[in-house]
Amino acid sequence: MRTAEERTFATQDGVELFYRHWPAVAGKAARALVLFHRGHEHSGRLQHIVDELNLPGYAMFAWDARGHGRSPGARGDSPSFATSVKDVDRFIRHVARAHGIALENIGVIAQSVGAVLVSTWAHDYAPRVRCLVLAAPAFKVRLYVPFARAGLALLYRLRGNFFVNSYVKAKFLTHDPERIRSYENDPLITRAISVRMLLALYDAAERVVADAQAIRLPVQLLISGSDWVVDVGAQHAFFEGLGSSVKDKQVLPGFFHDTLGEQDRAQALGRMRDFIERRFSENAPPPSLLEAHHEGYTKDEEARLARRLPLLSPKNLVFAMTRFSMRTLGRLSEGIRLGLGTGFDSGSTLDYVYRNRASGWTPLGKLIDRNYLDSLGWRGIRVRKLHLEQAIAAAARRLRASGRPVRIADIAAGHGRYVLEALDRLEVKPESILLRDYSDLNVSAGSALIAEKRLEGLARFVKGDAFDEESVARIEPRPSVAIVSGLYELFPDNAAVLASLRGLGRAVAPGDYLIYTGQPWHPQLELIARTLTSHRAQQAWVMRRRTQAEIDELARHAGFEKLEQWTDDWGIFTVSLAARL
C-alpha cells in the first residue's frame, strides 16, 4: 500500500484545505493524477484507487473539499459552488507549482459531485491538463420527493441557507461489503449538504451539460449501469455534447453509484488505466480555435441568433412585446433610456450599471430601473468589476514583490471607473494610469471622472483604437499591467482580436502582465439578440460567444500565459491574469 504525505494548500480566500500526496514509487514523478472524492466523502476513502490503479510511476494527490473530511468549514457547505470550482483550479495549480509537475502532465479523476466540480472547472477555466476521467458525475441527482427542487429553492429564498441530510444508504452505493461497512462507520463522512450547494450543483450541471461542446480535453466517462442516486440520462447527453476530439464512454452493467468503489471495480480501474496510459503516451494538442469565427458551434449559434424569427411565431411575438414595452413604459427607467440612446453595450451603459443606483421618472420608473439593474447579466457585470479590481491588485503585488514599477494602461476603458476605483485595493499607488477609448463621449466622461476623483497627476485619458496593432504597441509609458476588459466579447472576428493582442504583446515587456476578460456562456443570449441594440448604429446586439479555451488560445498566440482566473457564480464573465512570456 502506498503511503500518503499529509499537507495543506491555501485557497484564494486564505482557507487551508487538507490534501494527501502519494509520491511515485520510484524517484521524482514527472506525471501526476489528481483525485476528487464523491460528495459527503474525503480523500482517505480514495486510498484503494491509488493502490489498485497500479500506476506506480505517477504521483497521486487528493483533497478534502471544503466542509469535508479534515478541511475546515461547515460540513457539506461552501460559500458558493463557484468558490469550490475555484478551489479546484487553485489545487491543480498548487500541485503543478509545489511539486514541479507541468499542467500538461496532470490527469484528473473525479467521482459524482467531484466530477461535476471538475466538469464545471473544465468548462469555465479551460485548463490544459492531460485528460479527465469522470465516474458517475452527479449531473442530475434523483430527488424522489415530487417538486423537491422547487420546494428547496423556495425555502432557500425565504429562510436563507440550511442543510439537508443524504437519504442514500451505503448499500445503494456499492455491493462491496467492506466499502459499505467503512462508509457506515467513518466519522469523517459528511451526511449533510447545504441547500445552497445542492441547488447550485443542479444549476452548474445543467449549464455544463448544455454547453459540453466547450470542453475539449480528452475525457473518459464511466457510467454505472444500476445507479439509483443520479439520472444517467444527463451523463449520456453530456458525452454526446462533448467537444473533445478524444472521448471514451464505458457503461458498467450492474454497478451502483460508487463506480470506483464497487465490488467489481477492477473492470472500471482497468479501463481507466488503459485510457490514462494512452493519453500520456500521446501529446496531440486539440484542434486550434483561432478560426472559430469562421466555423464551429459558437459561429453557428451566432448565425442562428442573427436570423429573423417567423413573424407570427410565439417566440417572436414575446420578443416583440418586450421590445415594445422597453420603448414605451421602459423609457421611465433611466438605465433603459440610456441603453436605447447609446447602446446597451456602450461605455455609458456599463458605467451606469457599475454605479448601480436606480433612477427614473416617477416611482414606477425607479422600480423598473431597479429590476433592470438587477437582471442576471448586469449582476454578473458588477461581479466582473470586483474581479478586475482583484486582478489589478494581484498584478500589482507581483510587480512590487519583484521590485518593478506598476504602470497601468487600459486600451478600451469605457469611462474607466473600474480602473480608478481599483486604486483603493492597492497598497501603493501606481506610477501612472493611461486610459484609452475610441469614443469621444467616453474620453470626455472618463476625463471628468479623473477630475472628480482628483487623480489628474496620476491618470490621463486619451483617444485610441484598441484594434490598431501599431497604436497599441506604441503605448507610452510602457505598461507593466495592460488591461482589456469587455471589448473582445463584443466583436466576433478573431483576426481583429489577435491584432489587438499582438499590439499588447509588443507593448508589455516579458514578465509583466495582461488582464483580459471573457464571456464563455450567457443564459440570456437570445433575449439580448432579439430585444437590445448595440452601440454600432443601433444594430441588434448579437454576440458570438468565445469559450474560455478560445480566448486563452488567442492570448497565448500573442505571447501571454494565463496565471490565474476569476469567474462569477453563474459562469458568465471571466477575468484572467496572464504573464508576457
Protein language model regions, located:
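Short alpha-helix in the alpha/beta-hydrolase fold that links the catalytic acid
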Residues: 217, 231-240, 497
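Class I (Rossmann-like) S-adenosyl-L-methionine-dependent methyltransferase catalytic domain
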Residues: 375, 390-394, 417, 421, ...
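Short beta-strand/loop motif that positions the catalytic acidic residue
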Residues: 215, 221-223, 227
